[in-house]
Amino acid sequence: MPVTYQILPRHNLVYVRYSGAMMVEDSLKAFDTYARDPGARPGQRHLVDLSRITDMERDFARIMQLQATKGAELAMRETETLMVYFANTPLSLRAAALAKNGWSVSQGVIAVVFEREDAVMSALGLPCETIDDMLQTDLRKID
């Protein structure tokens, strides 16, 4: 699947990684799986890594459907969700802008986009420089 997620409880963070073609159906499946995951918690921050996408679905009605579905689920949690997008290519920046603009504060989502990994880590308050460092640090603490 071109979208995966990993819950990092020590960071109160859900890391979502897209690769290849970014398709609405894959996103819906991944979000549904996350919503049913026993590790999912209200208020978890989301880091959405779009740096590996090579294409994206352009059916904007379906993209808005995805945002509405996710927004309804997150709004029921009665706490704000920080959605941080990492996008470092023209395509991933377009995808991130589309996703960011699909959220509203009334849905309880604060969405921001960063082009550099160190800026992402700083915004999340993590003492890492890169996403890989964050993932490795989290793995070491589990061992």
Model-flagged regions — what are they?
Residues 1-143:
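Amphipathic, Lys/Arg-enriched alpha-helical "gate/interface" segment within cytosolic domains
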